[in-house]
């Protein structure tokens, strides 16, 4: 029998009390919890859970992601593998599941409901998962829920394909995650009544309050891409009596340079610093995801799996030790989860481009331009006089209007989609990426066509990755796994990403906090307001392509 004991101040979240205790662990489970008379400087509590994340956004395979986040007390994630599913289909999902099983960390994957985010009528992905594919996935024990339903128009209009996907989960008593930013109350009601139970896309507290009143659960998101904590954290105190079971924390997208510094523990510390009830905050971080998603993660009760964390600081939640299934996976600054060098998979069929491929023309006097916002994945739409791009529709550096392009990476010789974007701030150069939500085609923005072409061909030569360049220098961060993930450690990936980002800001001149991250969401046509994909400029509000 594998038996050991720890002594620490036991944080009993359920009964809202803290007391010194001796906790016995046997065969990976909590065997006993006994009060003791002692003065102790350590605290023990259940591990943290990220209630919605795309592991691929960290540029790390699951095992290497786990190696990093156990340092911050995270023991489990509710993971949506729709990034790799858009590239490699079910093979990509299986890649994530199989890699995750090589570690003690608890990954709970969902079946991606919208691959692509919209139908192939609207964008080109590497694969399409139809309702029959989803039904087969939902039969698997490794699939715990239906991941975020982004096609809100399909839900509201009762499109048979998306309704079948939702019902496939519900009939198996598996939950359905939502994604519904900016809907009117009437449309939100229709969306929620389909059986969708969560949303992590609330941008305003009013939207969140209304969804809570409908019985939905709200995930307070504070990740690398979108940051909504400041807008939504008052819900924690508002909901302490009525809706405390209905809140969770998530990152959604987490870049390695951010999670080197912390994960859900940072949100917990921040919420407590804002004066919210200590135990309510921990309930949101540790307990609510377990109960909602019905996942086998321990809550530090007798008989539970021994998933817990130890800290000396219940203000910052700097972690000293992390245990999963009774095994020590992080110990005083050292992660004990092994790094795994996976064999890459990919899906890339795109040949070299020429400068002339990036030409643009229109006869329209006024043309729509994407207006990006730092640290947000939404955009605004603005109209400009086409004379600002005279004489040959190039980027206008003085007005900060840059050409943006999407290249279909899956079907060679497809027409390049071209538009214009404001607020990027690049003065002399280009950046590009195959991390382009959600279909992950090649997305580029630059100060002229020559730079765009050079960045495109650098990415094509490497079959994916992140790129930034000017006349003097080209930097490429290789992402050999589906053009989304690296085989390297988090520390090395973070170092590369920081170097790229610094180059984008300090050399190319971008004023955005994270230019590559912002660029990656300019193609996500299920988040308002104006986006671009491989088939053209898309107005999310009117749900149609925009003619130039």
Curated annotation (Swiss-Prot):
What EC number(s) does this enzyme carry?
A: 3.5.4.2
As one GO molecular function, the record gives: adenine deaminase activity
Q: Does the keyword Manganese apply?
A: yes
Question: What does the UniProt keyword field contain?
Answer: Hydrolase, Manganese, Plasmid
| InterPro entries, alphabetized | Adenine_deam, Adenine_deam_C, Amidohydro-rel, Metal-dep_hydrolase_composite, Metal_Hydrolase
**Coiled coil regions in record:** none
The Swiss-Prot or TrEMBL record lists the needed cofactor(s) as:
Mn(2+)
Q: Which domain of life is it from?
A: Bacteria
Instruction: List the catalytic activities from the record.
Output: adenine + H2O + H(+) = hypoxanthine + NH4(+)
Please state what class of enzyme this protein is: hydrolase
The Gene Ontology biological process annotation of the record reads:
adenine catabolic process
Family, per the entry? Belongs to the metallo-dependent hydrolases superfamily. Adenine deaminase family.
Write down what this protein is called.
Adenine deaminase
Q: Which organism is it from?
A: Borreliella burgdorferi (strain ATCC 35210 / DSM 4680 / CIP 102532 / B31) (Borrelia burgdorferi)
Give the gene symbol.
Answer: ade
